[in-house]
From Swiss-Prot:
Functional summary from the UniProt entry: By interacting with vestigial (vg), may control genes involved in DNA replication. Key enzyme in folate metabolism. Catalyzes an essential reaction for de novo glycine and purine synthesis, and for DNA precursor synthesis.
GO cellular component labels: mitochondrial matrix; mitochondrion
Keyword Chloroplast: no
Quaternary structure and interacting proteins, as annotated: Monomer. Interacts with vg.
UniProt xrefs under CDD domains: DHFR
Keywords: DNA replication, NADP, One-carbon metabolism, Oxidoreductase
Source species of the chain: Drosophila melanogaster (Fruit fly)
Top-level lineage group: Eukaryota
The protein's name in its UniProt record: Dihydrofolate reductase
Biological process, per Gene Ontology: dihydrofolate metabolic process; DNA replication; folic acid metabolic process; one-carbon metabolic process; tetrahydrofolate biosynthetic process
A GO molecular function held by the record: dihydrofolate reductase activity
The reaction(s) this protein catalyses: (6S)-5,6,7,8-tetrahydrofolate + NADP(+) = 7,8-dihydrofolate + NADPH + H(+)
Length: 182
């Protein structure tokens, strides 16, 4: 069974967004997101990023689709003509996973939001890990990360993951990996 990971940055009140944007500006965290979701061990493959409609359109137009990754948008209201060529439209996460299982060009699959997609993904038996950036501050948010089930446990960091508390623009944050155990 093909599995996936989630990647998210959350503040102390589990907020992840405000008015379709990120509530904070942390360049090094965005670079970490980009590097992590692009990294493959096989140079002939790429990774997929799976997101809901609001998350896709929340990415600045100049930066979407997210480069060097297969972008998959989950929506039952969009048409293929609403998205650029090369962006895959699927009605739900399981359909996207079945399509990805049929081809051999994708190495890693990353769930990148939003709230409803994260919730569905964490409940799935396909869910492997949650890469979470814990922002040690509260921000005004209107979109929140769902409660993390007890089946997730912290595991050792990846070799290229910055360790310990980081700080940028007066905002402290830390990278963690949680793995789902059955």
């Amino acid at each position: 069974m093909l599995r996936f990971n989630l990647i998210v940055a959350v503040c102390e009140n589990f907020g992840i967004g405000i008015r379709g944007d990120l509530p904070w500006r942390i360049k090094s965290e965005l670079k970490y997101f980009s590097r992590t979701t692009k990294r493959t061990s096989d140079p002939t493959k790429q990774n997929a990023v799976v997101m809901g409609r609001k998350t896709y359109f929340g990415v600045p137009e100049s930066k979407r689709p997210l480069p060097d990754r297969l972008n998959i948008v989950l929506s039952t209201t969009l048409q293929e003509s609403d998205l650029p060529k090369g962006v895959l439209l699927c009605p739900n996460l399981e359909t996207a996973m079945k399509i990805l299982e049929e081809q051999n060009e994708v190495e890693n699959i990353w769930i990148v939001g939003g709230s409803g997609v994260y919730e569905e993904a964490m409940a799935s038996p396909r869910c492997h890990r949650l890469y979470i950036t814990k922002i040690m501050q509260k921000f005004d948010c209107d979109t929140f990360f769902p409660a993390i089930p007890d089946s997730f446990r912290e595991v050792a960091p990846d070799s290229d993951m910055p360790l310990g508390v980081q700080e940028e623009n007066g905002i402290k944050f830390e990278y963690k990996i949680l793995e789902k155990h059955s």
